[in-house]
Each structure stands twice: as structure tokens, then as C-alpha cells.
């Protein structure tokens, strides 16, 4: 029934059903399978007709069809066209981001038909006239580059940085060759054996896979006059120089000048195309076929001559297109960037006190927001050992049984990233002293112990306000029934929170007063715990992450937040007022 409905819709849009055996034999959809077929249609453009085949997905209601180009005007063969891959697939919509009425098949496929027409018109216009070609290709230019290998940039590369590249070459278990290029800034912390070794380890590359030499690497900005409609991707170094000559002759001259000046055998060039992305190449020259020293001190007009010579088959012995992947610290943290005007977590001195369930989850969240990855540092405090009984509620593995949680967690964080970090674990309790506390910008109390929280709230008030760190108390309440986070920025304290007569009775949240909290705990000599799953601790860690990040904004929006899993409704985030009966605040008035 649905197939018949879809068939009628496609016919109404001007499509006809074509068996795969009747398609052009060069098309990747061609097949002798007598049962297989596709809906095809010719779309009109100023350059001629474009024939499209639609590949209908398993569920046409929630999956849009794939558009494949069967026939394209001859003038566009091997040319770069926006939204058309080299294999011939047309990207007419970003399906994962799109929204449509999945219950209205007719309107959905009519819109697909119209969108394909619009996309083809824009693509042809860009290829023929350069009309909005940079905009049409934005974000997808390098998708048509077709690299043979990957190059990972571990430093923040730009035109002003001096770069060098290492090559890792090894053999996969199936016998195929595995090559990876690794680029770093010469004067950066990433240019060290420790960082490179960490990268190889994380990438499961053998230590001995690294070649002994490094390659001269240059970062070149390209401001192309146009990008669409040109032959792409360049199949040789000669073709690349030809493309640069048409797109941006200054960039081409820089490439030749670097080779002329240095006279080396091997080069890596990274091309940063304006408003597009970065792609790279590796070239190797046969120095027996060309004496580069002859050109080093020659006249400026020799650049054009050298350009012609370098493109020769006997001179350029190797040419590889490289896919450039940025893996520097800014890229790693780019999706967690705060609003403009906010401080960076990587610059903050942070102490995480308590590396149990909450602290374990929180530490990983903090790292991914930059903690310990810049000028600041992340210190982890806990004197507790990690036991098998902790496994169900912790991020650590069986490898860490019998080891200090703080040390194991610090090692896990450092091993999860290839770049240098300032993360240190201390196998001891945090000493609640004013001189130690003021060495930090943010202190996170994840102990879940009221005596620790009250003592921190008291001692921090002996520090002058301008030198005082922000204290963030994170804890599960009601034996796992609630997640709570409180930011002590000086206006109220932990004591104020538990002294509020409207919400607390004898230090216990009034919503949990009817529960026999003590009875639910498992108590042994030297060990007390409450059995509940890790979900509440995950939530508390996430709330604490929000609290930490909110302290980076110019102004705090709240100091208290909670999430109730059972026992009542969650209160909205708010500023907790100072309580006149708070013993801590009253002591320091």
C-alpha cells in the first residue's frame, strides 16, 4: 500500500521508474538485477539537462532519498561543483539537521523535488559564473579533496608558526600499509618526544613506526578568485600549481619560493583556503633530476621557470593529497566554548576535593572543558583507595583496584589526551587552610561530608574577598533522591543553606524528614555507604559542571541548583539568601 502511494507521488513529481539494467553502464547504480530500479528525472538548467536518480530509503517517511547524478553536461566533467561529490551524489539537504512532516509523504517529496531543482540551479550557476561559489562551497570544499592519507596538526598552526611534520609508517594486521602524518609547531610544547609518544600510543601506532627525519612544513593562506568550476582535485603537483596559478598566484609563488629557498627533498604544504577549510599535500623531489641550489640565489623571474620545472614527472617523484585534521587544544575544546566575555577554564587553578563517584564523573567533564589544559591546573585530592565494590559507581576500571582514586583518576585524565596537561593527583585529604585555599580560583567540594563543607565555608571567610576562591559544594541528598549544587561566592554559605528554617530541619532537607536516612545506610567498621545507582551522581556531576562554568561568566545567574529524582519537585535555580541564624556567617560579620 505504501509502495503504491510513494509510486503515485513520484510520478506526480515528474519522475519515472527505471530499472537498474537500463541505466548507463558507467553509473555506479547500474546493475543486471532485474528487480532493482530507481526513480529518474531530468532537471533543466542554463547549462543543459541534469538527469537524477533517487535512491529510496528503507523508511521513506523518516529518511529522505539519496540523489545521484546519472548525466551531467560535458563541460562540468572533472570540475568542482558545489553540492556534487566526485562520485556523483547530490547533497540537496543536510538530512540529520532537517525537519519535515514525516506523516505527509506527498508534500515531503514535492519539497524534495523542488529542493533538488534549486540546488542544481545554484551549483551550475556557481560553476559557470562563479556566482556565490565560495558561499555555496562553504563547509564542503575539502570534502571533494579526496586525500590518500591523514595529517594531524597537534599545534595551533597559522602563517606565523614554524612547523615540522613527522611520519608514522607501519603495517596493519591485515598486511596493508598505515601512514599517518603528525605536524607540530617547532617551538611549542607539542614538539617533544613525550607528546609524540602519547599520540602514537593513543592512536595505537607502534613506537618504532616514526621515521627518523622530519619534514619541512609551510602554512599558506589562499584567497581564491573563484573555486567552483575548476578542475578538481589536482591529480599531480603540476595540476596543483596550475590550480593555484588560477586561484591565487601569490599562494603559488610562496610555494615555489619556499622550495627555492630551502632546496630540500621533502615538503608538506598546508593550504588554508579563505572561508573554506585547510587541505595539505606531501611532495618529494628527485634531487638527481634537479639542482635546486642553482635557483636559490637566482633572479626573481626564475620563480616562474622553477614552477614549470617542479611540475615535471621526472622531478616530482611523489605527490600525496593529505586530509588535514586539527587536533590542537583549541580545536579539542572548541565545541565547549563559552559566550563572548567569559573567562577560560583552562586558565583557572582548580582543586577537586573528593574523587569518588561525583568527583570521578566531574573530573572528566572538567577536562573536556579545558581544566588543566592551559596556564591553570587541576588538582585532585582524595586519600581513599579504589575497591572492587566501587566499580559499579565509578569511572575507573579494574586496573585501578587497590590504588588511590586521586592518582588513578589523574593518570586516566592525562592518558586520555595527547597534549600536555597540568593535572596532579594527591593521595591525601585536602588541608582546609587559608594559605592553601587562596592558591586556587575554584575549589570543588565533592566529598559529600557536611563537616568538610562547613569547615570550608568557615575558613574561606578568613581570606580577603579579592583573594577568595569560589567554593562549589556538590552532593547527593536524601540517600540518592536529589542532586544538589551550591556556589559560595561570598553572599551566602553552606551553613546558610542548611540553616534556612523554611527548607531544612536540623540540617536535613524537610522533604526527606519522613525518611529514616540512617536505616538505609550500610554501616561497617571503617566503611559506610548507601546503595543506589550512579544516575544521581551523574546528574550531580553535570550540575556541578554547569556551576563551574557559570563562575566564568561576567555575572553569576544563580548560586543554587538541584534535581529531585523522587520526593518532590525540583526547585528552580536561584540565589540562596544569607540566613540571619547562620553560625558561620555570623562569626565573620
Curated annotation (Swiss-Prot):
Gene Ontology molecular-function annotations: transferase activity; tRNA threonylcarbamoyladenosine dehydratase; ubiquitin-like modifier activating enzyme activity
A GO BP entry: cyclic threonylcarbamoyladenosine biosynthetic process
Keyword annotations from UniProtKB, A to Z: Antiviral defense, Isopeptide bond, Thioester bond, Transferase
Pfam families: Prok-E2_B (PF14461), ThiF (PF00899)
Phenotype for residue 91 to A: Loss of defense against phage lambda (partial), T4, T5 and T6 but not T2 or P1. No longer conjugates DncV to cellular proteins
Modification after translation, per record: Conjugated to DncV via 5 different Lys residues and 3 Cys residues.
Inducing factors: Part of a CBASS operon consisting of capV-dncV-cap2-cap3.
EC annotation from Swiss-Prot or TrEMBL: 2.3.2.-
Alphabetical list of Gene3D superfamilies matching this protein: NAD(P)-binding Rossmann-like Domain
SUPFAM superfamilies according to UniProt: Activating enzymes of the ubiquitin-like proteins
CDD domains per the UniProt record, alphabetical: E1_enzyme_family
Active-site annotation: 91 (for e2-like domain), 493 (for e1-like domain), 496 (for e1-like domain), 513 (for e1-like domain)
Assembly with partners or alone: A Cap2 dimer is bound on either side by a DncV monomer.
Family: In the C-terminal section; belongs to the HesA/MoeB/ThiF family.
Function comment: CD-NTase priming component of a CBASS antiviral system. CBASS (cyclic oligonucleotide-based antiphage signaling system) provides immunity against bacteriophages. The CD-NTase protein (DncV) synthesizes cyclic nucleotides in response to infection; these serve as specific second messenger signals. The signals activate a diverse range of effectors, leading to bacterial cell death and thus abortive phage infection. A type II-A(GA) CBASS system. Conjugates DncV to itself in vitro and to other cellular proteins in vivo; conjugation requires ATP. This primes DncV, upon phage infection CdnA activates and makes cyclic nucleotides.
Protein name: ATP-dependent ubiquitin transferase-like protein Cap2
UniProt gene name: cap2
Amino acid at each position: 500500500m505504501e509502495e503504491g502511494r510513494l509510486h503515485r507521488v513520484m510520478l506526480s513529481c515528474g519522475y519515472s521508474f527505471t530499472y537498474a539494467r537500463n541505466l548507463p553502464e558507467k553509473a555506479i547504480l547500474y546493475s543486471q538485477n532485474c528487480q532493482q530500479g530507481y526513480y529518474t528525472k531530468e532537471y533543466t538548467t542554463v547549462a543543459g539537462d541534469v538527469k537524477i536518480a533517487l535512491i529510496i530509503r528503507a523508511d521513506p517517511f523518516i529518511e529522505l532519498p539519496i540523489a545521484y547524478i546519472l548525466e551531467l553536461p560535458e563541460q562540468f566533467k572533472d570540475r568542482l561543483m558545489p553540492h556534487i561529490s566526485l562520485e556523483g551524489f547530490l547533497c540537496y539537504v543536510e538530512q540529520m539537521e532537517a525537519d519535515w512532516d514525516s506523516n505527509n509523504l506527498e508534500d515531503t517529496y514535492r519539497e524534495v523535488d523542488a529542493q533538488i531543482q534549486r540546488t542544481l540551479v545554484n551549483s551550475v550557476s556557481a560553476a559557470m559564473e562563479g556566482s556565490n561559489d565560495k558561499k555555496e562551497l562553504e563547509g564542503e570544499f575539502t570534502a571533494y579533496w579526496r586525500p590518500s592519507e591523514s595529517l594531524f596538526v597537534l599545534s595551533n598552526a597559522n602563517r606565523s608558526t614554524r612547523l615540522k611534520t613527522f611520519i608514522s609508517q607501519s603495517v596493519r594486521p591485515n598486511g596493508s600499509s598505515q601512514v599517518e602524518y603528525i605536524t607540530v609547531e617547532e617551538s611549542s610544547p607539542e614538539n617533544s618526544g613525550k607528546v609524540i609518544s602519547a599520540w602514537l600510543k593513543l592512536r595505537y601506532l607502534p613506537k618504532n613506526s616514526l621515521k627518523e627525519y622530519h619534514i619541512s612544513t609551510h602554512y599558506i593562506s589562499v584567497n581564491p578568485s573563484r573555486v567552483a568550476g575548476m578542475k578538481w582535485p589536482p591529480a599531480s603537483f603540476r595540476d596543483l600549481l596550475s590550480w593555484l596559478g588560477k586561484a591565487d598566484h601569490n599562494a603559488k609563488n610562496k610555494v615555489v619560493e619556499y622550495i627555492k629557498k630551502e632546496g630540500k627533498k621533502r615538503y608538506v604544504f598546508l593550504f588554508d583556503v579563505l572561508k573554506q577549510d585547510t587541505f595539505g599535500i606531501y611532495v618529494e623531489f628527485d634531487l638527481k633530476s634537479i639542482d635546486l641550489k642553482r635557483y636559490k640565489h637566482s633572479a626573481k623571474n626564475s620563480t616562474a621557470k622553477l614552477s614549470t620545472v617542479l611540475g615535471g614527472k621526472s622531478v616530482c617523484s611523489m605527490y600525496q593529497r593529505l586530509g588535514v585534521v586539527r587536533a590542537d587544544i583549541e580545536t579539542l575544546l572548541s565545541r565547549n566554548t563559552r559566550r563572548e566575555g567569559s573567562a577560560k577554564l583552562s586558565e583557572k587553578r582548580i582543586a577537586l576535593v573528593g574523587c569518588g563517584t561525583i568527583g570521578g564523573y566531574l573530573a572528566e567533564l572538567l577536562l573536556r572543558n579545558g581544566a588543566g589544559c592551559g596556564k591553570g591546573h587541576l588538582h585532585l585530592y582524595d586519600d581513599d583507595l579504589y575497591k572492587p565494590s566501587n566499580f559499579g559507581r565509578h569511572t575507573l576500571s579494574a586496573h585501578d583496584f587497590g590504588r588511590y582514586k586521586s592518582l588513578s583518576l589523574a593518570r586516566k585524565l592525562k592518558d586520555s589526551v595527547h597534549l600536555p596537561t597540568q593535572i596532579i593527583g594527591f593521595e591525601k585529604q585536602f588541608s582546609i587552610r587559608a594559605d592553601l585555599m587562596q592558591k586556587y580560583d575554584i575549589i570543588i567540594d565533592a566529598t559529600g561530608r557536611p563537616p568538610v563543607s562547613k569547615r570550608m565555608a568557615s575558613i574561606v571567610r578568613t581570606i580577603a574577598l579579592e583573594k577568595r576562591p569560589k567554593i562549589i559544594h556538590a552532593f547527593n541528598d536524601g540517600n540518592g533522591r536529589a542532586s544538589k549544587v551550591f556556589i559560595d561566592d561570598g553572599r551566602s554559605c553552606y551553613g546558610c543553606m542548611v540553616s534556612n528554617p523554611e527548607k531544612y530541619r536540623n540540617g536535613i532537607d524537610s522533604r526527606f524528614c519522613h525518611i529514616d536516612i540512617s536505616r538505609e545506610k550500610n554501616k561497617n567498621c571503617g566503611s559506610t555507604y548507601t546503595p543506589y545507582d550512579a544516575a544521581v551522581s551523574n546528574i550531580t556531576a553535570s550540575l556541578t559542571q554547569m556551576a563551574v562554568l557559570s563562575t566564568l561568566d561576567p555575572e553569576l545567574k544563580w548560586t543554587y541548583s538541584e534535581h529531585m529524582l523522587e520526593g518532590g519537585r525540583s526547585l528552580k535555580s536561584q540565589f540562596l539568601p544569607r540566613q540571619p541564624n547562620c553560625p558561620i556567617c555570623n562569626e565573620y560579620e
